Amino acid sequence: HRLFQQLLKQAVEEASFCMMVQNASALLARTGLLFHRQVADYAYDENWKRMFTVGIDYIDGEKWISDGKYYSCSTTVAAMDMTFALISDNLDVSVAEKIAEEIGYSWDSSF
């Protein structure tokens, strides 16, 4: 477990951004990188969250949220919207809208 956590932490530290879908934030939480960060809440064992994710601000009711380079979403369905938001943030909203249109996805860029 420790080797995986070390490799994950190093990869995320070196990355320009980090996307977490549903309970993937639980994996990253163990590295300490999410301490004092906001993360979209997800359905998971509440006891486990209390034990291993102290110091992480889980935001209830949000489909997705970004905090710095960290993007998290509460469901797999919300991952598409989060992805287009990341494209918009890092490239341009027009690029995200064009890609969404090309694949036939109805993305609301106002979020």
Which residue stretches match the model-derived regions?
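Active-site-adjacent pocket-lining segments in enzyme domains
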Residues: 1-111
